[in-house]
UniProtKB/Swiss-Prot annotation:
GO terms for biological process: [2Fe-2S] cluster assembly. One of its GO terms (cellular component) is L-cysteine desulfurase complex. Gene3D superfamilies: Aspartate Aminotransferase, domain 1 (3.90.1150.10), Type I PLP-dependent aspartate aminotransferase-like (Major domain) (3.40.640.10). It holds the Pfam family Aminotran_5. Keywords: 2Fe-2S, Cytoplasm, Iron, Iron-sulfur, Metal-binding, Pyridoxal phosphate, Transferase. [2Fe-2S] cluster binds at residue 328. Its cofactor is pyridoxal 5'-phosphate. Pyridoxal 5'-phosphate binds at residues 75-76, 155, 183, 203-205, 243. Homodimer. Forms a heterotetramer with IscU, interacts with other sulfur acceptors. This is Cysteine desulfurase IscS. It is found in: Cytoplasm. GO terms for molecular function: 2 iron, 2 sulfur cluster binding; cysteine desulfurase activity; metal ion binding; pyridoxal phosphate binding. The modification N6-(pyridoxal phosphate)lysine is found at residue 206.
Length: 404
């Protein structure tokens, strides 16, 4: 058993050995290293061919046409391209966008940027269970609404949104629907042929592929048109300029191929380990589940341990690689904006820990994690004056604290 135990798979995943080995064949003079845009010789033709193969593997996993895949540097760029691209191209049609308060920062910051240049954005507040209220969505649609952007699986809580019915609502109002599927692709079955989704973002490094490569699904029928964010060369059907990184795309294609083969076994494996973890810690006093075992993805478990700062617990659990939220915001001392949007009070949001498990997590590692959490919680609470006051029956909410 490795030490520390890696339980931050929602932040990134290790590259599968088979993926890494295959990527090595597309880097050196002995392999296929050509520029796929060089169509006058064999090196370019070979590079273009393997990219087409990768596109096919990606489309097979998500149920799309391979021609609907646009390569990007990752999900952050894909989210920006989808949101800004639709907004700028269709500005004459309308300037209103709908998203939610619990989206990834790459979506929220893109929307805030659009607000600064004249767009109007509605940020929906999910229900306390994290699910978007479909009636609330309908009420906020107006004649100027051009785009709805909702993530499939939340990166902090693992909550799964009902993108099937959201897509139907958007289609009935002739509104573009963008889905950030970074945490769901390869973990939950997706078939875009059965959904009215117009754009979908995803990344390779979340499903055992390389970092620095991702994609945006852009529907062809009915055709979705958007403005490019980068220009020069007309790559990716004019939507994303730049020489394609062949080795990364090959790695992405291979990781998606493996995900398609392993998705059912992975789902069972992750669900069992997540349930083992929760069953092992749920009887700790003042522990709160911020995820939903029925409406949540199998790889994420978000838990609050009252009267203990999440950062303190992370430091105490040196043998575990865990986080206090999204990898993009975990360095912030502010409580999770996602948990606050769900109505969770600051004290519990501050005490939250995200455990995220993966393909290589073992039952032995989960058993060790349960023991470590119990031990650290007991030790930290023994040092906590707040815990002592709580156990003495003091109503901490009635105390007026001096913040001077």
């Amino acid at each position: 058993m490795k030490n520390p135990i890696y339980l931050d798979y929602a932040a990134t995943t290790p590259v599968e050995f088979k993926v890494a080995k295959k990527m090595m064949n597309y880097l050196t003079i002995d392999g296929i290293f050509g520029n796929p845009a060089s169509r006058s010789h064999k090196f370019g033709w070979e590079a273009e061919e393997v990219i087409d193969i990768a596109r096919n593997e990606i489309s097979e996993l998500i149920g799309s046409d391979s021609r609907e895949i646009v390569f990007t540097s990752g999900a952050t760029e894909a989210n920006n391209l989808a949101i800004k691209g639709i907004a700028f191209f269709h500005r004459k049609k309308g300037n209103h966008i709908i998203t939610s308060k619990t989206e990834h920062k790459s979506v929220l910051d893109a929307c805030r940027y659009l607000e600064s240049v004249g767009f109007s954005v509605t940020y929906l507040t999910p229900k306390n269970n994290g699910i978007i209220d479909l009636n609330d969505l309908k009420k906020n649609i107006n004649k100027n609404t051009i785009l709805v952007s909702i993530m499939h699986v939340n990166n902090e809580t693992g909550i799964i949104q009902d993108i099937t019915n959201i897509s139907k609502i958007c289609r009935s109002h002739d509104i573009f629907f963008h889905v950030d599927a970074t945490q769901s692709v390869g973990k939950i079955a997706i078939n875009l042929k059965n959904l009215f989704v117009d754009l979908m973002s995803f990344s390779a490094h979340k499903i055992y592929g390389p970092k620095g490569i991702g994609g945006l699904y852009v529907r062809r029928k009915p055709r979705v048109r958007l403005s490019a964010l980068s220009h020069g060369g007309g790559h990716e059907r004019g939507m994303r300029a730049g020489t394609l990184p062949v080795h990364q795309i090959v790695g992405m294609g291979e990781s998606f191929k493996l995900a398609r083969k392993k998705i059912n076994d992975d789902f069972i494996h992750l669900t069992n380990l997540r349930n083992d973890l929760w069953n092992g810690i749920k009887n700790i006093e003042e522990v709160y589940l911020n995820s939903d075992l029925k409406q949540g993805a199998p790889h994420i478990l978000n838990v609050s341990f009252n009267y203990i700062e999440g950062e303190s617990l992370i430091m105490a659990l040196k043998d575990l690689a865990i986080s206090s939220g999204s990898a993009c915001t975990s360095s912030s001392l502010e409580p999770s904006y996602v948990l606050r949007a769900l109505g969770i009070k600051d004290e519990l949001a501050h005490s939250s820990i995200r455990f995220s498990i993966g393909r290589f997590t073992t039952k032995e590692e989960i058993q060790h994690t349960v023991k470590s959490v119990h031990k650290s919680i007991h030790r930290l609470r023994a040092l906590s004056p707040l815990w002592e006051m709580f156990k003495s029956g003091v109503d901490l909410n009635s105390i007026e604290w001096d913040h001077t």
